[in-house]
């Protein structure tokens, strides 16, 4: 990864020769497979001003024999080409290096039962042509039973398992067992897999999954400025990320190679890791049981608060309305702050613009996070205390800004209408601590029930925090529903620290993945954290301080988003790596 090495260049040929030598040193007896470039690949080559005539995708294939050649083999896969203009230390020299080191480690552990096939694909950046050639033409394709693919969309951060083959329940169970001892621990979530399936993106693993193969796709996406960038050098690459993805790949592949049987397609599992320590997984139907448990605990807490603290059902309804206001106003503010950093949606009309926005992503994340904090502080201060006209004015300006800079957005318009309506609702506040807390829990449980019915793999993001909040509320009733003793605050503090800390890390991953296009996704994270911490909010006497804090956060958010433009200006087109 010293120099860019796209298909057809001298540097590409040098990298190919070097890798063949390294594979031979590791006892893989490498062979080459040449395949035709697709029309889309040819078009990309010609678009950058080069000739495609005579070029092919040349895969490098190595085999580490197992003790039983009749068993289905394991496959480790990465691509060795880069885009023009980028050395590709992360994408995907890191994956190639990690695989070669994993081969060395697997050999050192002694012979495995299954054969390991190493596939370093070519022309991935052009149109996944190397993977297509292997899985459609190579004789080994029918021997593969499980796949571990390594990728990168950035130059750092924790490596995450973000894609599986179809029907992944058995795959997830094996991945969880395999990565218990991985350096850095497991990092994966069924929501990420669900969302990735809906995206137009693809990697070499996409071709394997289309054949129905079990397996996992690993990648890190932190330090997004390095993606397809001249800055993607070995010195700039996060060595911790390389270690993490390598350890996950090694332990998973080694587990597959020594397993009595490989995972098969069954149902999809619901799962997520807890702070990288373990993977919680269960069948989709279990989500309904968790919802029922959370609803029961919430009902118990409401009963206790009603009898001990005089809770009225109308206050719970106001708490629900406050949560809807937070979601809608947070989305409006997030979109406005986001468009200050650059175009969004269909207005991102070139690779140059896309990569420039990636470099600005850290600025966007902090800015959008501050915008969400502003909405939270305004919620806690009270719309009436701040001034309904003042809040409405801010929301309208934010909506107009989004429309002018970002274009027509029906979701944003709907959110603006909801936020304005609730801002002027005269009976939409004064829900009290218990009403506000339980109302937010009820809102999240309702959202969790909808998600459980439509997409159970995504519902746990709502169900788990709601269950934690419901447990805390029920425990608080048992300790002291009047919230007079210090001990009564303990359940909410514990839930906020543990579940809230998990959500903060989750939110960072969400923004790295989809924040450029859907910044309002952080509104869900904000709602969940407020749900956990709602009883800890200060008394109404501190409303002025909260209002000042909200204004300061929003102004700082706008300033940071604009600063991203100045700090990361759009470079000349020639300086951009175009895939």
Language-model region placement:
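Solvent-exposed, well-ordered amphipathic alpha-helical segments
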Residues: 106-110, 170, 174, 178-181, ...
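Soluble extramembrane regions of membrane proteins in the secretory/endomembrane system
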Residues: 1-282
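Cytosolic-side membrane-insertion boundary helix
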Residues: 264-294, 312, 357-363
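C-terminal domain-closing interface element
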Residues: 142-163, 287-310
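Alpha-helical transmembrane segments of integral membrane proteins
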Residues: 294-579
């Amino acid at each position: 990864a010293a120099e860019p090495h796209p298909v057809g260049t001298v540097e590409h040929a040098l990298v190919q020769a070097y890798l063949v030598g390294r594979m031979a040193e590791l006892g893989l007896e490498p062979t080459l497979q040449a395949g035709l470039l697709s029309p889309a690949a040819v078009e990309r080559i010609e678009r950058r001003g080069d000739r495609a005539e005579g070029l092919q995708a040349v895969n490098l294939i190595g085999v580490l024999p197992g003790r039983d050649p009749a068993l289905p083999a394991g496959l480790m896969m990465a691509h060795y080409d880069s885009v023009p203009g980028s050395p590709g230390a992360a994408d995907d020299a890191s994956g190639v290096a990690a695989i070669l080191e994993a081969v060395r480690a697997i050999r050192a552990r002694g012979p495995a039962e299954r054969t390991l096939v190493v596939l370093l694909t070519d022309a991935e950046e052009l149109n996944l042509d190397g993977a297509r050639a292997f899985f459609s033409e190579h004789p080994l394709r029918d021997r593969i039973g499980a796949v571990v693919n390594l990728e990168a969309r950035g130059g750092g951060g924790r490596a995450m398992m973000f894609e599986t083959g179809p029907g992944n329940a058995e795959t997830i169970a094996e991945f969880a067992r395999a990565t218990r001892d991985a350096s850095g621990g497991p990092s994966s979530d069924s929501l990420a897999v669900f969302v990735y399936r809906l995206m137009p993106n693809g990697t070499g693993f996409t071709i394997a999954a289309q054949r129905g193969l079990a397996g996992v796709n690993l990648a890190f996406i932190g330090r997004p400025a390095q993606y397809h960038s001249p800055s993607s050098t070995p010195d700039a690459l996060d060595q911790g990320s390389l270690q993490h993805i390598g350890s996950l790949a090694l332990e998973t592949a080694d587990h597959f190679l020594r397993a009595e049987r490989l995972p098969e397609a069954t149902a999809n599992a619901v799962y997520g890791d807890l702070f990288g320590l373990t993977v919680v997984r269960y069948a989709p139907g279990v989500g309904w049981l968790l919802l029922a448990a959370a609803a029961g605990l919430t009902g118990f807490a409401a009963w206790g608060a009603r009898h001990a603290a005089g809770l009225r059902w109308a206050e719970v309804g106001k708490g629900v309305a406050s949560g809807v206001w937070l979601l809608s106003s947070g989305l409006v503010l997030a979109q406005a702050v986001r468009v200050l950093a650059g175009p969004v949606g269909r207005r991102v009309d070139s690779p140059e613009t896309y990569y420039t926005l990636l470099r600005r992503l850290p600025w966007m994340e902090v800015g959008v996070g501050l915008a969400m904090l502003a909405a939270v502080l305004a919620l806690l201060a009270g719309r009436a205390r701040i001034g309904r006209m003042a809040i409405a004015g801010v929301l309208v300006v934010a909506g107009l800004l989004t429309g002018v800079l970002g274009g027509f957005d029906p979701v944003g318009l709907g959110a603006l209408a909801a936020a304005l309506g609730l801002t002027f609702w005269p009976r939409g506040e004064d829900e009290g601590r218990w009403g506000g807390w339980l109302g937010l829990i009820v809102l999240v449980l309702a959202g969790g029930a909808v998600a459980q019915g439509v997409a159970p793999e995504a519902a746990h993001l709502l169900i788990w925090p709601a269950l934690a909040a419901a447990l805390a509320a029920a425990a608080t009733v048992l300790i002291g529903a009047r919230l007079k003793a210090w001990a009564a605050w303990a359940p909410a503090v514990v839930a906020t620290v543990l579940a809230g800390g998990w959500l903060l890390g989750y939110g960072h991953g969400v923004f790295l993945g989809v924040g450029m296009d859907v910044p309002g996704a952080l509104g869900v994270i904000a709602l969940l954290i407020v749900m956990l911490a709602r009883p800890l909010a200060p008394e109404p006497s501190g409303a002025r301080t909260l209002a000042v804090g909200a204004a300061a956060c929003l102004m700082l958010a706008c300033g940071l988003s604009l600063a991203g433009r100045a700090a990361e200006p759009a470079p000349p087109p020639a300086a951009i790596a175009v895939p």
